[in-house]
Amino acid sequence: MGKFKTVNELVNSLQPDYPVYCIRLNEIKKSVRFFKNNFPGKILYAVKTNPNEKIIKQIIANGVNEFDVASLNEIKLLNKIKSDAKLHFMHTIKSKESISSAYFDYGVKSFSLDSKDELRKILEATNQAKDLELFVRIAISNEHAEIDLSRKFGALPSEALGLVRLCKEHSKKLGISFHVGSQCMHKISYSKG
């Protein structure tokens, strides 16, 4: 497919009767640079937001080499594009088979969880691995999000400390994570997290 200066030009020229991707690679480049210049922490691209190979390659080309993956298919996609990218399996509900394959077949060491049951699955599926990086996802208020996920994922704050202590016994690195909800438009939500 060709390049077009605007979406209108594409529509007028092709008159498609099927969905069309309009990828603005320069905008991706600018966005990655903005993040890198303004965010002091590690930047992970959440593959589920858009698993298009061209987009992922552009993100990699601009210096992002760590990815939030939510499924084995996303892990396989990243392995195909950049086998040495660092992957973080951040979905809190995973099958033992997915955990095992992620760990043994693709070298994923970083996993998110929000329950003792998920910790047990991770430990069993990795044969009690000693090099795990575990992230306890804590449920926070999603009051400013279009889609509130606070009741779906995350350990309750009252249970989180015990889970963090338990994970400390089984992890090389330990962290916490939270999700402010989908389409969150208020930066205060990040401060509350």
Identify the function of each model-found stretch.
Residues E133-A139:
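ATP-grasp fold ATP-binding core
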